[in-house]
A protein has these predicted regions:
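Cysteine-centered catalytic environments shared across enzyme families
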Residues: 1-174
């Protein structure tokens, strides 16, 4: 089990308090990334490629950054498809497949993944953040728009414990 969180906005001081609530999900490593008003963090429980899978995973050759929680069961198949398109995969870490797969196939890549997952991919060049989870929601991904900024996390506590988050019932949705 790993944890991911992040948000958009100028003030990156929220990241440490968000990470506090996902830390229990990933005891092996912790990292963060901030650029162009995008702030990402991950805590990792190492399952695949114990040495090379620390996150956020920076794909320097295509200028993407990824945080990932999950497991890709058809890893070998997807790795081969991505390599056939000319991309180099340097590790055996699931996380490394996400950005080049997304770059090649766009959001169609998400339906090609067999597994359980939640992730965020930041395209630095185009300043575009994409978040996704598996279709069954096995891996949690909570999100909220607060003051026109996106906040997301593997743990709802990362969001609702922010001092400006207002907890209220949406009666219309009942």
């Amino acid at each position: 089990m790993c944890g991911i969180c992040g948000f958009t906005g100028k003030d990156n001081t929220f990241l440490p308090s968000m990470v506090k609530h996902i830390r229990r999900r990933g005891p092996d490593s912790e990292g963060n990334f901030s650029k162009n008003n995008i702030h990402l963090a991950a805590t990792r429980l190492s399952i695949r490629d114990l040495k090379n899978g620390n996150q956020p995973f920076v794909h320097e050759d295509i200028n993407f950054v990824t945080v990932f929680n999950g497991e890709i069961y058809n890893y070998n198949y997807l790795k081969k498809k991505i390599q056939e398109k000319g991309y180099s995969i340097k590790t055996n870490c699931d996380t490394e497949l996400l950005a080049p797969g997304f770059k090649i196939y766009n959001s169609e890549f998400f339906s090609m993944i067999e597994g359980m997952f939640a992730f965020a991919i930041y395209d630095v060049t185009n300043d575009q953040l994409t978040i996704s989870r598996d279709r069954y929601g096995i891996k949690p991904l909570y999100y909220s728009l607060i003051n026109n900024e996106l906040f997301f996390s593997s743990s709802a506590k990362s969001i609702y414990n922010l001092n400006f988050f207002q907890k209220r019932l949406n009666v219309k949705s009942l």
